[in-house]
């Protein structure tokens, strides 16, 4: 698949164009220079053709962090097949822009000069100044007004190869039901082949370092400056025939310290959690657990995600393994199902073990429990500890059935569902964990009457 890199200095409208092409607000847009710090990648449809588009950070030398941004942007340009170099049309062209553009031309890629912020015909008269760049492929546009953006996209589409068509042969002997079964089987296989993993944690615990260690390359910018990642970064890799997409989320600060663009980043982080399957809760092993860590862990409970607790910076940890685990279990009682792994993203020690653990907890997160076995376990649990009566009347679970996954959701069909105390539900959850491999996943238990629909009940996980 061809790659398109959007390159340019800060605040020329790169992320706005990226969002316009995606037809949604995906990258964070702000008047603050340097909002985009990592390279964002998305698969997009341009006309009848597909491509991967790369939104890069602004190219400008100001400090160490911006030098890293510049380096990653230029690496993206080298990796791309088509380069869209953006400039601010409200300013006169400067020598730095010309030098960068000419250096990009030497890469031998298809390259267009995109002059943004040309909002009307009068402003378009200034475009002749930009012919000094030495290219005929010049596109004066206004992303904010959607002015002449289509002309640019038509040019991009012409540079892309035609979409390959795949011919599928159908056995004429198959009847409709067999075809339907094949289709359903392919759908299930497709659904279970992709795992979305959110990397969560407070500012500067090493989330981006962990992402880079998992991918074995620097995809996310790492800096000693707290809060370097202010957008969510998606990166995919294949492991054991599974497509694992890591979502490096923005570091979450204390609520009182969240301002401006970081507030929007936090909202986007929460939105991304809605599509996540597994959460890696990253903690700094060189520091104690904070209230902020507990608040972030609350998002995992809120979105009912599978979870792995990652004690990062273990190479400089101040506590023994036993002490660290005890602290985690004491502070995160609602994540008692989550396995704990110690590692160092910096040295990459034990990082590779995360992959097998991710596959395991995802399998448990999406598992279907055999109905017969499930009911035997529930029946034995009631015999072992009878459900306390409610208002002087007996309370019984008639039968149990699993009605959904991610996480496993089990309906407890009862004579008096309102009489099942939360402590007994917790007991049942523990019994289920003793009998089934459910490490890493919450369990949702929903008491209900016969004939009551599952979606009418509240979700409570254990």
UniProtKB/Swiss-Prot annotation:
It comes from the Bacteria. One of its GO terms (biological process) is ribosome biogenesis. Keywords: GTP-binding, Nucleotide-binding, Repeat, Ribosome biogenesis. Pfam families: KH_dom-like, MMR_HSR1. InterPro entries: G_ENGA, GTP-bd, GTPase_Der, KH_dom-like, KH_dom-like_a/b, P-loop_NTPase, Small_GTP-bd. GTP 2 binds at residues 201-208, 248-252, 312-315. Gene3D superfamilies: 3.30.300.20, P-loop containing nucleotide triphosphate hydrolases. GTP 1 binds at residues 8-15, 55-59, 116-119. Residues 2-164, 195-366 form the EngA-type G domain. Disulfide bonds: none annotated. The keyword Nucleotide-binding applies. Residues 367-451 form the KH-like domain. Belongs to the TRAFAC class TrmE-Era-EngA-EngB-Septin-like GTPase superfamily. EngA (Der) GTPase family. Associates with the 50S ribosomal subunit. This is GTPase Der. It comes from Nitratiruptor sp. (strain SB155-2). The lineage of its organism: Bacteria, Pseudomonadati, Campylobacterota, Epsilonproteobacteria, Nautiliales. The gene is der.
């Amino acid at each position: 698949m061809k790659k398109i890199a959007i390159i340019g200095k800060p605040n020329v409208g790169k992320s706005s164009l990226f969002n316009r092409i995606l037809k949604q607000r995906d990258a964070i847009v702000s008047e603050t220079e340097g909002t985009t710090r990592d390279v964002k990648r998305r698969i997009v449809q341009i006309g009848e053709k597909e491509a991967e588009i790369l939104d890069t950070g602004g190219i400008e030398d100001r400090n160490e962090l911006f030098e890293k941004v510049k380096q990653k942007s230029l690496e993206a340009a080298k990796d791309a097949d088509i380069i869209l170099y953006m400039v601010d049309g409200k300013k006169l062209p400067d020598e730095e822009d010309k030098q960068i553009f000419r250096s990009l031309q030497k890469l031998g890629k298809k390259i267009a000069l995109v002059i943004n912020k040309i909002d009307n015909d009068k402003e378009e008269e200034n475009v002749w100044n930009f012919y000094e760049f030495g290219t005929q492929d010049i596109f004066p546009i206004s992303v904010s007004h959607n002015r002449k953006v289509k002309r640019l996209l038509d040019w991009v589409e012409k540079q892309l190869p035609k979409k390959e068509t795949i011919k599928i042969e159908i056995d004429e002997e198959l009847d409709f039901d067999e075809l339907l079964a094949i289709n359903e089987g392919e759908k299930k296989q497709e659904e279970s082949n992709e795992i979305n993993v959110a990397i969560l944690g407070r500012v500067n615990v090493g989330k981006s370092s962990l992402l880079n260690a998992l991918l074995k390359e620097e995809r996310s910018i790492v800096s000693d400056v707290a809060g370097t990642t202010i957008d969510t970064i998606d990166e995919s890799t294949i492991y054991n025939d599974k497509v694992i997409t890591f979502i490096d989320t923005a570091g979450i600060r204390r609520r009182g310290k969240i301002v401006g663009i970081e507030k929007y980043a936090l909202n986007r982080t929460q939105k991304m959690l809605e599509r996540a399957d597994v959460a890696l809760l990253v903690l700094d092993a060189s520091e104690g657990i904070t209230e902020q860590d507990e608040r972030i862990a609350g998002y995992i409970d809120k979105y009912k995600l599978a979870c792995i607790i990652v004690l990062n910076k273990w190479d400089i940890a101040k506590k023994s393994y036993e002490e660290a685990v005890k602290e985690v279990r004491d502070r995160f009682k609602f994540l008692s199902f989550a396995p704990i792994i110690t590692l160092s993203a910096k040295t990459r020690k034990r990082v590779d073990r995360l992959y097998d653990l991710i596959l395991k907890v995802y399998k448990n997160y999406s598992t279907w429990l055999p109905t017969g076995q499930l009911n035997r376990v529930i029946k034995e649990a009631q015999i072992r500890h009878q459900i306390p009566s409610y208002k002087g009347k007996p309370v019984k679970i008639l039968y149990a059935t699993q009605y959904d996954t991610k996480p496993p959701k089990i309906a407890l069909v009862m004579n008096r569902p309102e009489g099942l105390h939360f402590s007994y539900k917790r007991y049942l959850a523990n019994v289920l964990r003793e009998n089934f491999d459910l490490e890493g996943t919450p369990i949702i238990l929903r008491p209900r009457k016969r004939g009551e629909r599952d979606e009418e009940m509240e979700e409570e996980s254990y």
